[in-house]
Amino acid sequence: AYYAEKIPQYDEDIRAGRRKLISYKEIRKAIFEVVEKYEIKVVCAHNSRFDVNAVNITQRYLTKSKYRYFLPYGLEVWDTMKMAQSVIFKQKRYKEFCKENGYMTKNNQCRKTAEILYRYISGNNEFIESHTGLEDVMIEKEILAYCFRQHKAMEKVLYPAPLPKPIEEEDIYCFEDYLKYL
């Protein structure tokens, strides 16, 4: 899954027009626009702590820590790994599936990767996760849907949305200032 191993594939996809290379600034701007346009209140990923940390660290690096957070303020972050912990990992059938297929950790715990969860819920034990963005999102949405179909109480939230922050005039200027860094 290491990124450097994917570079030839990304290069080919960019040349073929299947992917577009854009700046970090453009990515963040697009996310803000989509969140606002569709009034999105929640984002979700498998092991979302990794993703949130990665984008925040990149944000801090690029702006020399002047701007610390990548996602829009007030957006709640859900984690399908937490959800699966509540509703899938407790299933006797999932535990048997992991044991039968050698999907156990050295501490004899069932592994919790999106790839293994997708193998379990899809019945496709040959599935290999591509770790290339959109393709991964497509399996993570299946994990999310599967968790909701269980109709059980589950922990979802990585970070609850904070109370709405009043918009100050200085915030508008800060965002314009931020754009200079990218």
Predicted features, each with a name:
Residues R19-S23, I27, V42, Y69-E76, ...:
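Glycine-rich, flexible loop segments associated with nucleotide phosphate handling
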Residues V35, V55, Q59, A84, ...:
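Hydrophobic residues within well-ordered, non-membrane alpha-helices that form the packing/core
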Residues K29, N53, W78-M81, M138-K141:
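Non-catalytic, well-ordered alpha-helical scaffold segments
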Residues A1-T58, E115:
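Conserved non-catalytic scaffold segment of RNase H-like nuclease domains
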Residues K99-Q109, Y120-I121, F127, L134-L182:
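Acidic two-metal-ion nuclease catalytic site recognized across multiple nuclease folds
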Residues E39-A45, S65-Y67, N125-H131:
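Short helix-to-loop capping/linker segments positioned immediately adjacent to catalytic or ligand/cofactor-binding
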Residues A1-R15, T80-V137:
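Active-site-proximal helix-loop-helix substrate-binding element of RNase H-like nuclease domains
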Residues F50-W78:
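Substrate-recognition/cap helix-loop segment adjacent to the acidic, metal-dependent catalytic center
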